[in-house]
């Protein structure tokens, strides 16, 4: 395939400058047996109509929530998205992945980010929020690094009730700086407070917990905050934002940094994203927080305006000392969350959370009454719960899929001690009929 912008003469001049005879010499470090010494096996171009048909046929191979009844969660959730969210997102003024390079000119974009930050602060009970992160997992890892920078310590405690894939991302981020990670054991679906006490020491920068946790269980943040602060460590909380419609905010419970995955706030399910990481913290840690921050100010004539503030923390000012490496930002996803929260309002948001709680309780009651199924713990939960099964989860999910039902997550792949256990999710979208259908199908399988 030819690289169109360069002429033959330009390529000749570049090769001469590099003192090589041909482009193959530029790849001499790659063994010849690993090189593709032929043209790519790509067919000719397609017309727009043909391409659209081809893409539709590929998309048709997917099995998504539009074709099934979804009881699968574990970090990505099937919540209702008001149609106005997509409409507003599609406006040309907003539809880009990039922050303007002369940001103060784009006051509308900056104001939307400022409103997003304000809403995240209201939800989390924190003083300040950034303009968004890549996703919940990277936001948590960045928060761990931030806590180490704030405390100048090099150890973090990570709850084993945190999302297993989030924990893997945290391990990856902390491996390079050589930060020690110690996992907190769990019992009855909750982090063991005694284990936290035992592992906390003067080297500990932070305790990382999830609220509600991976099993849907609601951790006692107040007690964990007391334990962490007694040793000079910070409490970092990864939250489900929908749960904050009815649960106490992490800020009220003593959290220092709050992060989470914002996909539930108006962003559709998509394998590979893009999703939305959010981060908020107390005022005193603001300068250590990664990512862009939009502030409100007044111009020389006293008119309200919005600016990117504290930019010295960012990579376009001090790349080697920047607090993060965020380039293409998640501002469009942050806008989706802003529009969603604005549309549903305070009461609507609370109602979404209450519906999740009520429908989860109904599903728990029905499924636990079935022969061959039981609840391993009696811990209070939100939106998700663990169910012990007699049949193998793999068999159950295969049978459910025949009925166009996406079943729960097989926990045995993440927690060997929970082989034969499934994690079910029930959002506000699930109807009484769908929950009863799930119970009927599970009853038939057992």
Swiss-Prot record:
InterPro entries for the chain: GcvPA, GDC-P_N, GDC_P, PyrdxlP-dep_Trfase, PyrdxlP-dep_Trfase_major, PyrdxlP-dep_Trfase_small
Gene Ontology MF annotations: glycine dehydrogenase (decarboxylating) activity
GO biological process: glycine decarboxylation via glycine cleavage system; nucleoside metabolic process
Catalytically driven reaction(s): N(6)-[(R)-lipoyl]-L-lysyl-[glycine-cleavage complex H protein] + glycine + H(+) = N(6)-[(R)-S(8)-aminomethyldihydrolipoyl]-L-lysyl-[glycine-cleavage complex H protein] + CO2
UniProt EC number: 1.4.4.2
Superkingdom of the organism of origin: Bacteria
Description of how the protein assembles with itself and partners: The glycine cleavage system is composed of four proteins: P, T, L and H. In this organism, the P 'protein' is a heterodimer of two subunits.
Family statement drawn from the similarity comment of this UniProt entry: Belongs to the GcvP family. N-terminal subunit subfamily.
Reported function: The glycine cleavage system catalyzes the degradation of glycine. The P protein binds the alpha-amino group of glycine through its pyridoxal phosphate cofactor; CO(2) is released and the remaining methylamine moiety is then transferred to the lipoamide cofactor of the H protein.
NCBIfam families associated with the record: PRK00451.1
Official protein name in the record: Probable glycine dehydrogenase (decarboxylating) subunit 1
């Amino acid at each position: 395939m030819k690289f169109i912008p360069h002429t033959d003469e330009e390529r000749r001049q570049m090769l001469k400058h590099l003192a090589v005879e041909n482009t193959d010499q530029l790849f001499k470090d790659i063994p010849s047996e690993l090189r593709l010494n032929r043209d790519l096996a790509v067919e000719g171009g397609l017309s727009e109509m043909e391409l659209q048909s081809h893409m539709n046929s590929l998309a048709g191979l997917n099995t998504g929530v539009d074709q099934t009844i979804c009881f699968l969660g574990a970090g990505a959730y099937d919540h209702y998205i008001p149609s106005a969210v997509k409409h507003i997102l599609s406006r040309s003024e907003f539809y880009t992945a990039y922050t303007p390079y002369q940001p103060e000119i784009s006051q509308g974009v900056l104001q939307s980010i400022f409103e997003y930050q304000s809403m995240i602060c209201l939800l989390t009970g924190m003083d300040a929020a950034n303009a968004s992160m890549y996703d919940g997992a990277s936001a948590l890892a960045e928060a761990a690094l931030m806590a180490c920078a704030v405390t100048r310590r090099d150890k973090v405690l990570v709850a084993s009730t945190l999302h297993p894939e989030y924990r893997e991302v945290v391990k990856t981020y902390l491996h390079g700086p050589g930060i020690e990670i110690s996992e907190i054991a769990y019992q009855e679906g909750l982090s063991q407070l005694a284990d936290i006490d035992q592992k906390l020491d003067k080297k500990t920068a932070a305790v990382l917990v999830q609220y509600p946790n991976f099993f849907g269980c609601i951790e006692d943040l107040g007690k964990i905050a007391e334990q962490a602060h007694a040793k000079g460590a910070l409490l970092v909380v990864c939250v489900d934002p929908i749960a904050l419609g009815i649960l106490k905010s992490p800020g009220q419970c003593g959290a220092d940094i709050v992060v989470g995955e914002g996909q539930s706030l108006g962003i559709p399910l998509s394998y590979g994203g893009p999703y939305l990481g959010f981060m908020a913290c107390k005022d005193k840690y603001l300068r250590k927080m990664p990512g862009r921050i939009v502030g409100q100010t007044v111009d020389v004539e006293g008119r309200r305006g919005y600016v990117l503030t504290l930019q010295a923390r960012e990579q376009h000012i001090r790349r080697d000392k920047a607090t993060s490496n965020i380039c293409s930002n998640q501002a469009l996803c942050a806008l989706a969350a802003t529009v969603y929260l604005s549309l549903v309002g305070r009461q609507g948001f609370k109602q979404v959370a209450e519906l999740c709680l009520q429908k989860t309780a109904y599903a728990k009651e029905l499924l636990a009454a079935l022969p061959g199924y039981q609840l391993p713990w009696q811990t209070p939960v939100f939106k998700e719960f663990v169910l012990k099964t007699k049949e193998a989860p793999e068999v159950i999910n295969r049978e459910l899929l025949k009925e166009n039902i996406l079943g729960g997550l097989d926990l045995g792949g993440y927690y060997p001690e929970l082989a034969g256990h499934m994690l079910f999710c029930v959002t506000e979208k699930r109807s009484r009929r769908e929950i009863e259908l799930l119970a009927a199908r599970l009853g038939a399988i057992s």
